[in-house]
């Protein structure tokens, strides 16, 4: 616990926030993954960055520091066993924009605390919210079965078929 407290960075996020706040005059980047985007912006704008670009980078910077703070906040809630804190911070990394939300006219995306859900789509169209809902429902049901012993079929988050291998 004391090692975690010692490693909480206060100065870095403060500098990032200050730069992001001053996006009218400052371009802030928070990741080496943004280098190429910044270089392209500078090349396309005679060595400068546009206000739209600076606003976008500011948004990403504030998102990054908010994410960092959320991880710390949730850590303290976990060690204090605070099941229902006054403010709950839900955070995640964008994994994938989905084909559509619960209904075709709605947008949706999958976020995760990790960078990968360890799900591989083998065939078919891009998944929708309903497809992911079915996947997670099937996984929840299958976890109650003995390992490698059965199959679960789900439609609209409702199990419509479960089989168990009698030889298991």
Residue map of PLM features:
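Active-site/ligand-binding-proximal alpha/beta "capping" segment
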Residues: 1-13, 17-19
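Conserved short-loop catalytic and cofactor-binding motifs
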Residues: 4, 26, 126
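Alpha-helix C-terminal capping segments
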Residues: 17-22, 141-145
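Mobile "lid/hinge" segments at catalytic clefts and subdomain interfaces of large enzymes
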Residues: 22, 26-35
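Active-site loops and adjacent core secondary-structure elements that bind or stabilize anionic groups
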Residues: 35-41, 45-168
């Amino acid at each position: 616990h004391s090692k975690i407290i010692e490693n909480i960075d206060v100065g870095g996020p403060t500098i990032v926030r200050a730069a992001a706040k001053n996006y009218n005059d400052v371009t802030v980047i928070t990741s080496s993954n943004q280098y190429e985007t910044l270089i392209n912006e500078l090349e396309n704008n005679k060595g400068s960055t546009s206000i739209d670009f600076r606003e976008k980078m500011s948004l990403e910077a504030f998102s990054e520091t908010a994410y960092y703070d959320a991880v710390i906040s949730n850590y303290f809630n976990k060690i204090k066993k605070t099941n229902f804190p006054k403010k709950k911070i839900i955070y995640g990394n964008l994994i994938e924009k989905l084909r559509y939300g619960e209904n075709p006219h709605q947008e949706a995306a999958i976020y995760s605390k990790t960078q990968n859900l360890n799900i591989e789509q083998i065939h078919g169209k891009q998944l929708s919210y309903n497809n992911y809902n079915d996947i997670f429902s099937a996984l929840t049901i299958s976890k109650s079965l003995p390992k490698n012993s059965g199959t679960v079929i789900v439609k609209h988050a409702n199990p419509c078929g479960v089989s168990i291998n009698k030889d298991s």
